[in-house]
A protein has these predicted regions:
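Membrane-embedded transmembrane helical bundles of large multi-pass transporters/channels
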Residues: 1-39, 105, 136-440, 553, ...
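Structured non-transmembrane domains adjacent to transmembrane bundles in polytopic membrane proteins
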Residues: 49-70, 79-166, 439-629
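Conserved catalytic loops of ABC-family nucleotide-binding domains
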Residues: 286, 940, 951-988
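Conserved beta-strand
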Residues: 784, 788-807, 825, 835
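Glycine-rich P-loop/Walker A and Walker A-like loops and their local beta1-loop-alpha1 context
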Residues: 796, 806-831
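Conserved ABC transporter NBD signature motif
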Residues: 832-843, 851
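Q-loop/switch helix immediately C-terminal to the Walker
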Residues: 861, 867-904, 916
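Hydrophobic anchor residue at the start of the ABC signature
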Residues: 929, 933
């Protein structure tokens, strides 16, 4: 992965303006389309298959008007007047008539209608006007809602107070607010303190804002076609903004650190994306996987939220590894810390420390690579060294004063002195913070969670005050009356039984449908929809189903807002533990792959559980119990939104793994180099502490900004995430982790051998990139077409070295299996197991893709020609592969290849010329082989590798084979031929082309002295 990211970073740097233009086009297209279609969110929480949802679905068929969306117009008479006054009554009735004439309105029930039930408050000051739409809330247009409010607002002019409630008025068109600005402001302050540069501080903000724009536009577009919760876009923006800034911070820190140490800007950008970017991709993928894991829960609205947030994270990751290096390419070396600055001194000191660790006698090259944790090097501790890209050489030579030990260094030393004390303190503190979580009460959001002053909140509060809290959440009982013979009396009896249930305020009369199959009862509880007593009432109503059915023969189901909330909460509660096991299990597996350890992932998972518990506890204490509610701008307390626990686990999991990787990867790198466990903890912590601190503070401020200024359910989610990030970063990762790692010592890095063989090796630390850069530097020192040094492929025998100049002919002799393996490695088809190998300037195996495109491999032993195919057809088919589908193969190309074959056959005893009409079955084995070579030549590759296998034509009795192959290939093509043994006369058959002889260990070198005929001939090859 690191090598792929290295190439992406280098490409983005070189093609900076193209990459920037591409992102501008993507953002513009999404924004333009999304805003043109005008997506709208809604508070719709349903779970297919639950009793409440099945009841709603049934009502849609039997009572279409009752199943449609509803709105309540709450009208309060002017002071000193009553809604029963003739003037007020007439005005309200006129508005009801106007509403009834609107499109999409199925029915309007005036508070004075005979069908109205308890629509006027006891004190006569408030009336409820019911508006029933002909479809679900998603179908009600903005134009219709505007017409409803316009008609109702005419009462305001007459001194009445009007508010609008119901699901349709909980829908929200969303947009960016001051909340995001507050988070960005705090993030900018942290970034400026971290980098000490406005330009550097602005880049993470810019990339994050572009990511937020892309995700915002995408969700707006999707909301125009499907139901999207109003929480989803704000959650996506909040997550996208936080991770977007953090991911850019990690990569940019690495880049500035390398620039300060003198690395070329392009190389630095590529390596930053490859190392820190690899950790970013890993962290982003864990968040995305966890969020997409919400799909398995089977709750549509939660799935949409998970996908929306995952898309925001995907956008943040993609921008960090593409757009950010492009901006680095535009900025060139301007992002380097100023020579002599604190950032420069720290970065240089970290480089000096790394050199001291590895080999004091070997100077660090500009292409040296460190782990992603060193991305924070510029903001760690250090000593003076040469600054990067200094315009004034004398300035570079100025002595710089050493920096004091960093706060992170002092902190980790303190923790390591008394690890048990810190472990007990952290676990005890987080355990106490988790206690309120045991009283966690889950429910769906109601209008009570809307901001004060919002119309739906005013309507909700007015109804609760004037009619009773239960009127905001009517329970619907749907009875099947197909088996009753006395409908009227049975419905009256059921109503009486329902009224007798504890917690019921009133019950409306049973209303049968037109076919007398089903009847509905409106049950008004005495308590609010989200009250525990109302939940208990729903359960009591459901418990009496058997009794009612036995007495009246009428089975019934229970639905309504509270019933839906109970079903949703139950479904979420049932999914919470399996999902938690899945998330924690995933974390253990992923970290075991990354760190090659058992203890590290188990410790990380336990720390994650502590963070989640503390986050739950604090959220319950504030939003449910009211602790510090006023201080935090929480204006109403009550149950926690049902999907918060599972959503928090998904998001916090990824963020926790993010910090774990950046801290512990440095520890692992140090331990691998020194085998000193205590030193590894100290040095690794110092490498990553400052950047993790900055990242955690940014996330905390971004999330926390949504608490006092956010809307609805997002406030609780924001607080939970803010607390979770703070606890996980500062108490768990930066205190508990070094304490536990100190106690475990070298046992922290133990991994059973059998498990190590099973687990894939995730190269987050960039080890493959180090190897790639070393191989690339080695390849640049050799100008031959193919060069190998101590090359070994499993099954090929002892290592071999050789150097094949461009345009020469090389003959490899040895066992067939060994030759074929070496040939396949040269062609980029298989990876070498050891040694160095370069082909046409590309190092293998990391650049096997370009090599495979420029090298043709012809394995004669594996050929299976169709005896009935003609020579012309075989050549035309191969030549056609290299042409566009609409072009024909020029006849001259086919004739040219046949001419080359005949030229090679000329003078070979027993061989005759061929033409396009000869079938392959009519050809001799040697001619068939030369035709196969010609098919390979048709690819016009720079290197042609031919292995003769065990064919008779490869016997020394056919000495002209090498010359025949060489004459078919272009003179500029480097030809490598594999034979069992090489006759002496091969040297003369290749003409004036250089001949290189390579004898694999154990091969018969032949009886020729090739030194006089081949100026580059070698055995083993030059080094």
């Amino acid at each position: 992965m690191a090598t792929l990211l290295y190439r992406i970073g280098r490409f983005a740097f070189r093609k900076a303006w193209y990459v920037v233009a591409a992102w501008v086009l993507v953002l513009g297209a999404l924004l333009g389309t999304g805003l043109a279609l005008g997506g709208q969110t809604q508070e719709s929480f349903t779970i297919p298959g639950t009793e409440s949802q099945q009841t709603i679905d049934k009502l849609e068929n039997l009572f279409p008007s009752a199943a449609g969306a509803a709105a309540t117009v709450v009208i309060v008479a002017p002071d000193g007047q009553s809604v029963n006054d003739d003037t007020v009554k007439q005005e309200i009735s006129d508005v009801a008539d106007d509403l009834g004439n609107l499109d999409q309105v199925a029915a309007v029930v005036s508070p004075y209608s005979e069908y109205a039930t308890n629509a006027i408050s006891e004190d006569g000051t408030t009336a409820l006007l019911k508006v029933q739409f002909d479809g679900p809330a998603t179908d009600v247009t903005d134009a219709t809602l505007t017409q409803v409010t316009t008609a109702g607002d005419t009462l305001d002019a007459d001194g009445m107070t009007v508010a609008y409630g119901g699901e349709v008025f909980s829908n929200q068109t969303f947009g960016l607010t001051i909340t995001e600005g507050i988070g960005v402001l705090f993030a900018g302050i942290v970034l400026f303190i971290t980098f000490g540069s406005l330009l550097a501080a602005g880049l993470p903000l810019l990339s994050a804002l572009i990511g937020v724009g892309v995700s915002f536009a995408g969700i707006t577009l999707v909301a125009a076609f499907t139901s999207v919760s109003s929480t989803a876009p704000m959650l996506a923006i909040m997550i996208g903004l936080a991770v977007g800034i953090d991911y850019a911070l990690f990569i940019l820190s690495r880049h500035r650190s390398q620039l300060a140490r003198g690395m070329d800007a392009e190389e630095s950008a590529a390596q930053s994306v490859a190392t820190a970017g690899a950790a970013v991709v890993f962290a982003g993928l864990t968040v995305i996987i966890a969020l997409l894991g919400l799909l398995v829960v089977g709750i549509p609205f939660l799935s949409v939220m998970g996908v929306a947030a995952a898309f925001a994270v995907f956008a943040a990751v993609t921008i960090a590894i593409t757009l950010l290096p492009a901006i680095m390419g535009i900025s060139k070396g301007k992002l380097a810390p100023k020579p002599g600055s604190r950032a420069a001194r720290r970065a240089i000191a970290a480089a000096s420390h790394d050199d001291e660790k590895t080999d004091a006698a070997t100077p660090a090259s500009p292409a040296s690579v460190t782990s992603p944790s060193a991305g924070a090097a510029e903001i760690e501790s250090g000593a003076p060294a040469k600054p990067a890209e200094s315009a004034n050489p004398a300035e570079s030579a100025k002595p710089t004063k050493p920096t004091k030990p960093s706060l992170g260094g002092r902190w980790v030393r303190l923790v390591m002195k008394a690890p048990i004390v810190f472990i007990v303190a952290v676990v005890g503190l987080l355990g106490v913070a988790s206690i309120p979580a045991f009283s966690l009460d889950l429910n769906l959001p109601t209008a009570a969670s809307q901001p004060e002053g919002d119309s739906s909140r005013i309507a909700y509060d007015t109804i609760a005050d004037k009619f009773g809290p239960g009127y905001n959440g009517t329970i619907v009982v749907v009875a099947d009356i197909t088996q009753t013979t006395d409908i009227q009396n049975d419905l009256a009896g059921i109503r009486s039984d329902l009224e007798a249930v504890d917690g019921v305020a009133t019950v409306g009369p049973g209303l049968p449908d037109e076919t007398l199959d089903t009847a509905i009862f409106q049950v008004v509880p005495t308590t609010a929809p989200d009250a525990p007593e109302t939940k208990a009432l729903v359960e009591r109503l459901r418990d009496m189903k058997g009794e009612v059915e036995a007495q009246y023969g009428t089975p019934f189901t229970v639905s309504g807002q509270t019933a839906v909330a109970i079903d949703v909460s139950n479904q979420l509660s049932n999914a919470l533990i399996p999902f938690g096991i899945l998330v924690i299990g995933l974390s253990i597996l992923l970290l075991a792959m990354v760190f090659r350890s058992i203890a590290v992932p188990i410790k990380a998972a336990l720390g994650f559980a502590l963070s989640v518990g503390a986050s739950f506890g604090v959220t319950v204490a504030v939003f449910q119990n009211g602790l510090f509610a006023d201080l935090l701008g929480v204006h109403s307390t009550g149950p926690i939104i049902s999907f918060l626990p599972i959503l928090l686990m998904a998001i916090l999991f990824g963020l926790a793994m993010d910090y774990e990787v950046f801290l512990v990867s440095g520890m692992r790198e140090e331990y691998v180099k020194t085998k000193d466990a205590r030193r590894a903890v100290r040095v690794g912590f110092q490498h990553g502490a400052r950047v993790v601190t900055a990242a955690a503070l940014i996330m905390f401020f971004v999330f926390f900004a949504f608490v006092p200024e956010g809307e609805g359910a997002i406030k609780a989610i924001a607080l939970a995430l803010a607390v979770g990030v703070f606890v996980d970063a500062f108490l768990v990762r930066m205190t508990l982790v070094p304490a536990i790692m100190t106690l475990l010592g070298k046992h922290a890095w133990y991994l059973p051998k059998w498990l190590g063989r099973i687990l894939p090796n995730v190269d987050v630390e960039g080890e493959s990139l180090r190897e790639h850069i070393e191989e690339r530097e080695w390849a640049r020192r050799h100008d031959g077409a193919v060069t190998a040094e101590d090359l070994a492929v499993e099954g090929s025998g002892a290592p071999v070295s050789f150097d094949i100049p461009a345009g020469s002919v090389a003959v490899i002799t040895g066992e067939t299996a060994a030759r074929r393996l070496i040939g396949a490695a040269v062609a980029g088809r298989i990876a070498p197991d050891a040694g160095h190998l370069q082909v046409l300037g590309h190092c293998l195996p990391s650049e096997s893709g370009p090599v495979a495109k420029r090298v043709t491999l012809v394995d004669l032993e594996s050929r299976r020609p169709d005896a009935t195919t003609t020579v012309g057809d075989a050549l035309n088919e191969r030549l056609r592969l290299g042409l566009p589908w609409f072009r024909r193969v020029p006849q001259g190309d086919t004739e040219e290849l046949i001419g080359r074959i005949n030229g090679a056959l000329a003078g070979i005893e027993g061989e005759t010329p061929i033409d396009i009409h000869r079938t392959l079955g009519e050809l001799t084995p040697l001619t068939q082989s030369l035709l196969a070579v010609a098919l390979g030549v048709a690819d016009r590759s720079d290197v042609l590798v031919v292995d003769a296998g065990d064919g008779d034509f490869a016997h020394p009795s056919t000495p002209a084979f090498a010359g025949a192959v060489a004459s078919i290939a272009d003179r500029s093509t480097t030809v490598i031929i594999g034979l069992e043994s090489e006759p002496a006369s091969h040297a003369s058959t290749v003409g004036d082309r250089a001949l290189v002889r390579i004898a694999l260990p154990g091969a018969d070198p032949g009886d020729a002295d090739l030194s006089s005929s081949s100026p580059t001939a070698s055995k083993g090859g030059p080094r």
